[in-house]
Amino acid sequence: MTGKPAYKRVLLKASGEALMGSQGFGIDVSVADRIANDIKQARALGVEVGVVIGGGNIFRGVAVASKGGDRVTGDHMGMLATVINSLALRTSLHKIGVDSVVLSAIAMPEICESFSQRQATAYMDEGKVVIFAGGTGNPFFTTDSAAALRAAEIEADALLKGTQVDGIYSADPKKDPGATRFDQLTHKEFLDRGLAVMDTAAVALARENNIPIIVYSIHENGGLADILQGKGRCTIVSDN
């Protein structure tokens, strides 16, 4: 890997579902290990990496609300699921010698450190991979919004969203064979089209802070390093 990376510091958003692999629930350790290896390759390029992982492989707060339950409690349960996933990724990173730390938006000092912007940037300056757990710490906000928020706080050069497909499509390509993939969109075009790959609050926050969003397939081995070097299939959401 000799290509010069296009970004110095990035925030990687991975869905909880990505950690399931072919399982119907929970964490496939082999998938966590592969994502960790992708992050190691990014670090080898000299790129500083922050990570936000969703919790949908374990629990979704909206599922509680849809069945008449309390959305706030459901979202708190979902935040705890992101902590579990974050600890799993940290374990996978440590196995391959990548120094990493979990910072949680919800205080749980016996398990991981609490989030602060200053500490997060200090760790990244030291070369550590920082995994942000607990979402934003508030209900009614998705982990997409948490990713955009943390990207702004650490002054990331880009927000990378690893998904099930290789970019943003006009429709779900798994359901519509005629769906077309976009190479590039502006933040406004994304919002105007009502595309569902990332929630509007996250995209609006990225736009306000001039953070490009890059959507790519998280299932490609070495895909993260390729994207960082300007290679690979993806969609770039940027106003520049």
UniProtKB/Swiss-Prot annotation:
Annotated segments matching region Involved in allosteric activation by GTP: 21-26
Protein residues bound to UMP: 55, 75, 136-143
UniProt cross-references to Pfam families, sorted A to Z: AA_kinase
Keyword Nucleotide-binding found: yes
GO cellular component: cytosol
Catalytic activity reported: UMP + ATP = UDP + ADP
GO biological process, one term: UDP biosynthetic process
Residues bound to ATP: 13-16, 56, 60, 163-164, 169, 172
Enzyme Commission code(s) on record: 2.7.4.22
Subcellular localization: Cytoplasm
Keywords: Allosteric enzyme, ATP-binding, Cytoplasm, Kinase, Nucleotide-binding, Pyrimidine biosynthesis, Transferase
GO MF annotations in UniProt: ATP binding; UMP kinase activity
SUPFAM superfamilies per UniProt: Carbamate kinase-like
Pathway note: Pyrimidine metabolism; CTP biosynthesis via de novo pathway; UDP from UMP (UMPK route): step 1/1
Regulation of catalytic or functional activity: Allosterically activated by GTP. Inhibited by UTP.
Similarity-based family: Belongs to the UMP kinase family.
HAMAP family tied to this protein: PyrH_B
Listed NCBIfam families: pyrH_bact
Function: Catalyzes the reversible phosphorylation of UMP to UDP.
Record note on quaternary structure: Homohexamer.
Full protein name: Uridylate kinase
